[in-house]
Design a protein with these regions (language model features):
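Histidine-anchored nucleotide/phosphate-binding helix
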Residues: 206-214
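Short acidic loop-to-helix transition motifs that present clustered carboxylates
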Residues: 182, 204-205
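Long, compositionally biased, glycine/small-hydrophobic-enriched stretches that function as flexible linkers
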Residues: 2-181, 186-194, 198
Length: 227
């Protein structure tokens, strides 16, 4: 059985890491390919072999519950960096030989980048982009390839949080410019008689497409939105 080591979310087995299969349902093969994709993205940022959009999509793809398709992840690796095999990229991504505190800071920064890229991706779908944020993602991926002092990682961690706030502001601008300001609305809390589609998240573009599909095709489903 293939081994894995995934500890990027709060659902991990025994509050340490998932080592056989993710509590989220992610397979070991998927987890290892995601590690390889992150490493490929770092090399792509270093050698300029992938676009900012590709790097953004790569990181977004690896957040919890975003994409468990091993075929999709392999294709993303092939588009991103081909200088090393998937096996080599996976081994390098394990971060075995680094100090625990440094490794933890690197991972925390990386998870911040993943969230940042999720916001950037949603904003980009609506036509909103910010070069400074894309440049930060690229430069930080390269920075994480190198060895630095703990205090330098702490400084970068603060900067990552700052950039994350800017990404949220960009997404808010994209959403309100496209759909208007949110308004408090009265909704029914009664039990419905039809099947329902439960939506969680903030991809308003896809949500609009789904709503249009449901209400123009007279589908026998209700749409429930939760954030």
């Amino acid at each position: 059985m293939e081994e894995m080591f995934c500890f990027q979310c709060q659902e991990t087995m025994n509050e340490t890491a998932c080592t056989v299969q993710g509590m989220c349902g992610k397979s070991a093969a998927c987890a290892n390919l995601q590690d390889a994709l992150i490493r490929a993205s770092q090399y792509a940022a270093l050698y300029d072999t992938a676009s900012d959009e590709q790097l953004m999509n790569n990181l977004f793809m690896t957040i919890t519950n975003a994409n468990f398709s091993t075929a999709d992840i392999r294709r993303a690796i092939e588009k991103t960096y081909t200088g090393k095999s998937v096996e080599e990229l996976t081994r390098e991504g394990c971060l075995k030989n680094r100090k625990e505190t440094v490794r933890s800071l690197q991972e925390l920064i990386l998870y911040g980048l993943k969230g940042l890229c999720a916001y950037l991706s949603h904003a980009a779908v609506l036509g909103f982009r910010k070069a400074e944020l894309s440049s930060f993602v690229r430069s930080t991926l390269v920075y994480l390839l190198e060895d630095h002092e703990q205090k330098e990682y702490l400084t970068l961690l603060d900067k990552t949080g700052e950039m994350g706030v800017q990404a949220m502001a960009l997404l808010d601008e994209a959403n309100t410019a496209t759909y208007g300001q949110p308004e408090i609305t009265t909704v029914s809390l009664e039990t419905g008689s039809r099947p329902g589609i439960l939506v969680s998240g903030h991809d308003l573009h896809d949500l609009k497409e789904l709503l249009c599909l449901l209400y123009t095709s007279d589908a026998a489903d209700d749409l429930l939105c939760v954030d």
